[in-house]
Amino acid sequence: IIYMLSRYYPEKKLIVVPTTALVHQMSSDFKEYGYQDECHKITAGADKDSDAEITVTTWQSIYKMPKSWFNQYKVVIGDEAHLFKSKSLESIMKKLTVCPYRFGFTGTLDGTLTHRLVLEGLFGPVEKVTTTSELIESNHLAKFKINIITLKYSDQTCNLLRRAKY
């Protein structure tokens, strides 16, 4: 869906994802889907300026940019939009004052009214496309059963591993 939106709108697009791995994955996916040009990828230390039609970035890489930098974008797409409740992400969205097209995608809306209102303030009305049950019933998602396994360790083992560095 993000790729199709990116192809539909001719204006410059800013795609905000939560991790650097997703910056590279999304850019790679776009190439695989047939996008001929390079997506500009912004991660820590990367040049923030580009004439590319599509910029893919983490919020950590751009939240300190001035409002004037954001004026070049007319489309913003937030992947994993449920993470947009942080102050830095909200500040990015508030700097996009000349950006008429805003899209946020998530499969993990937490259900609280406050969170929903924050997302609607940043992106617009929430549209629920489908549910897990509907995906299972239409055979787009496998039926699954979750078994919880609780592991109980001795106090000695817990104390030994309490200071472990992973």
Region roles according to the model:
Residues 3-32, 89, 111:
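Conserved Walker A/P-loop ATP-binding site and its immediately adjacent core
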Residues 44-75, 85-91:
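Conserved helix/coil segment N-terminal to the catalytic DExD/H
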Residues 74-75, 82-147:
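Post-DEXD/H (motif II) to motif III coupling segment of the RecA-like Helicase ATP-binding lobe
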Residues 164-166:
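Conserved helicase/translocase motor-coupling segment
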